[in-house]
Amino acid sequence: MIDPVNNFKIPEEWIARSGLPREELEKNVASGMIVILSDGSVLKRGYTTGTTASAAAKAAVLSLKKTVDSVSVPTPVGLRAYLEVSKSSPGRAVVKKIPNDHESDVTRGLEFVGEAREAEGISILGGKGIGIVKRDGLQVPKGKPAINPKPMEQIRAAVQEAVEELGLKGAEVTILIPEGERIGKETLNSRIGVEGGISVLGSTGFVEPWNDHLGEMRGDLIRCTDKVVLTTGRIGMKYSHMLFPDYTVVMVGSRISEGLDNASGDIIICGLPGLVLKWGNPKMLEGSGYATVVEMLEKAPEHERLKEAFEMAVEKGKGARIVVIDRDGSVLMDSKSGK
């Protein structure tokens, strides 16, 4: 069974642990709307702001000629997304961003409004509630509405479908988010140079049910600070905030190298040994007789490969401070102290 959003092959033991009928799982996994975890837990994905904006835009165009109560739009990963239209009138449609299991997603339930009129060709405009980019270096040019390139392509594709369905020459669509300015203050936008609303984002069209700093915004946040901690997960994030209170802490998961490419200034890499040390030496367990880095640490804390992997991480860090912690926040290795 393959998760079509991230192309991950789900292990059979994870599927068995879920306790759910296989047919039901296959259907939901194929839709892109659920994630199966290693313990068998099933979490619900949602749709990104890009997908929701696409639905509002397409529905607005369709409403020029007919009544619309639901809409289907393409996503960047090739799946179709299906959303209800909560309100519509000729040339105007409202779509709500559906809830998901991402507890920190402040945009859940937010209304996206599309306003459309017939035109020559297709044009997409950002209206009230979509932030404006105020600095250089982001994916969207300074002074433009904060609709990232991938969701802009998605919105245009959705509008193109509507235009072709109705036989129009084109359409001009304005996307508005009535509560966008208020919600934007609860996001990272002000820290990366986007003001006046939220950003329209989404590289896959789906929101993962955990906080990864909203995908592509992660790189923007790293680039906008000169004191950053790149951490590997929730535990690392919690203790990094405690260990390095003067730093901006960004969770990069296994994408440590990608985070480093975006970072400059004072950089710390902090996390659990399983990710940090294996990033240093991906082959550290080969032929060692140990199944995991944690097992090696517990059974052979002085193992030469632990030291070797740490030294390789320091070398790959190119001057970044490397800090390895355990699950209770104790520092196991620190390149600054030589520990």
UniProtKB/Swiss-Prot annotation:
Keywords (alphabetical) are: Cobalamin biosynthesis, Methyltransferase, S-adenosyl-L-methionine, Transferase
* GO molecular function term, any single one: cobalt-precorrin-5B C1-methyltransferase activity
Gene Ontology BP terms: anaerobic cobalamin biosynthetic process; methylation
InterPro entries found in the cross-reference section: CbiD (IPR002748), CbiD_sf (IPR036074)
SUPFAM superfamilies assigned: CbiD-like
Q: What is its EC number?
A: 2.1.1.195
Give the pathway annotation.
Cofactor biosynthesis; adenosylcobalamin biosynthesis; cob(II)yrinate a,c-diamide from sirohydrochlorin (anaerobic route): step 6/10
What Pfam families does the record tag this protein with? CbiD
- Origin superkingdom: Archaea
Q: Which reaction does it catalyse?
A: Co-precorrin-5B + S-adenosyl-L-methionine = Co-precorrin-6A + S-adenosyl-L-homocysteine
The cross-references to HAMAP family, in alphabetical order and at most eight, read: CbiD
The record's listing under NCBIfam families reads: PRK00075.2-4, PRK00075.2-5
State the similarity comment. Belongs to the CbiD family.
**Protein name per the record:** Cobalt-precorrin-5B C(1)-methyltransferase
* Native source organism of the sequence: Methanosarcina acetivorans (strain ATCC 35395 / DSM 2834 / JCM 12185 / C2A)
